[in-house]
């Protein structure tokens, strides 16, 4: 009985991983060119990475230390916004509030999101000192050895652990024109499936009520497990048929000293912050506008909405992830919010509905929703590549929607792998 209790999620997870690969197979450009041995290796790598992260004791210690640093940065940033904006930025309240009204005083744009500026400044400083560059180079070398990807793609993929859709391609800018179609698709997919070191801290802040002190460990784990998933799914949808592109780290920091690096990073963080706010307002407003139009079309008591339609699409995916039947609709709705709007809104909603979900489902969804795979990110993706490689516009525009589908499959696979071992691994 006890063995069956632990065995069923593993079997369901294997079925789920096979299901996601089958979906990718259905939209593959060249099914005969798929190298199934590499696909299988990618699936095994996801499981191995997760087990290593949670079974090797010092891994947990490292992530707890990182989490402590992030918590300190969060408190320092909140102190700074309190100084600048007063109580609306997290400073002392000049009036009394009831406990029920306390939550309404949380202003996302002025209290949680400014953490982006702090981490961007720190990341810029670490890049100038060469610390971040060495980490990225090491990851690129590791990916090349394990997954047999070209050196340029290895650096590009590993860069996405720390950088975003628009920043990571700059690390291999001289090689972008030379990338094969499969490599370009993989780079686009990892940009949408991944997140950034800057935003990881923001995830931890928003999910503090769900993840507690294990927040940073789970967020980083979700990002790392997604990397082999990206290579797996991308190689199914757009198999490699050309010679891989070699390359090395080519990014040079434009600052001439540490102070300038810190300043440039802070301003860059400000641009990212403004971009997040603008995109959230624009996308949420557009979705609400379309929803109001769809509300005019109804069948009896059934009213249409973009999120509602996407919820129906997501229900089979959350089943493949291993979400119980009685929680599938809520989970699918959260995934739909993540794709239609963004993961920040979905994480906020998760905090509201979490009492209707069991802890395992909560964690599966956290892993599945980590990443930039949403409609607005396609605009950022196309805008970035349009500036960097305008000569390949027709190619990356055509691949962009497939990259979004692939990214959703990849993050869903991360949630599936987590669900397979939930309750077995000690740190969960």
Q: Where are each of the predicted segments found?
A:
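Structural signature of hydrophobic alpha-helical transmembrane segments
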Residues: 6-18, 111, 304-305, 365-377
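Hydrophobic core segments of alpha-helical transmembrane domains in multi-pass membrane transport
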Residues: 16-27, 42-54, 116-125, 194-205, ...
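Hydrophobic alpha-helical hairpins/lids featuring a short glycine-rich hinge
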Residues: 75-145
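Juxtamembrane inter-helical linkers in multi-pass membrane proteins
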Residues: 136-171, 243-261, 304-312, 334, ...
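Long, contiguous bundles of hydrophobic transmembrane helices that form the permeation core
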Residues: 223-272
